[in-house]
Structure formats: structure tokens, C-alpha cells
Amino acid sequence: MSAKNNIQDQLLNTARKEKIDLTIYLLNGVPLKGKVVSFDNFTIILENENKQNLVYKHAISTIIPAKPIKLHSEETPKEAGGV
């Protein structure tokens, strides 16, 4: 999958650049709130009240932004190779 089609990276990068608050739910149900400081292939650094959390992506269930995030290249299912 090319970088422009990587929805995960697009969402996290837009949230970081626009300083959008996120609620990240872990697999055990614990919610973490904050802004994305940085991320890589395996982790996200989330900051809230001047405290940083290093969150491993494999522990994440759901990411909910405080407002809708427009992805750069939203495609219709047909354009994406769907039916």
C-alpha cells in the first residue's frame, strides 16, 4: 500500500498538524485523550496536560477524533478497487 493511500498515517498526520484532540481506546477499554505529538510504524506519542504517553499501536482498538478529519485522497469504493 502506497503512502498516499495509508489511511492510518493520513489520519494521524492530519491530527498532528491541525492539533486535533483524539480519544484513543485501548484493547482493554481504557480511553486516552490528547493530541498527537509524533508517531511511527509501531507507536504514537499522545500529549495531554503537558504529559506524554507512548502508546503502542498494537494495543489500540479505536481512534476517535474530536472533529471530522478530511483525508487527502478520499476515494469512492470503485476507485479504490471495490465493487
Curated annotation (Swiss-Prot):
Q: Its quaternary structure?
A: Homohexamer.
What name does this protein carry? Answer: RNA-binding protein Hfq
Q: Which GO terms describe its molecular function?
A: RNA binding
Protein species of origin: Leptospira biflexa serovar Patoc (strain Patoc 1 / ATCC 23582 / Paris)
Superkingdom assignment: Bacteria
Could you tell me what this protein does? RNA chaperone that binds small regulatory RNA (sRNAs) and mRNAs to facilitate mRNA translational regulation in response to envelope stress, environmental stress and changes in metabolite concentrations. Also binds with high specificity to tRNAs.
Output one GO BP term.
regulation of RNA stability
GO CC terms on record?
cytosol
InterPro entries xref list: Hfq, LSM_dom_sf, Sm
- Location of the Sm domain: 9-69
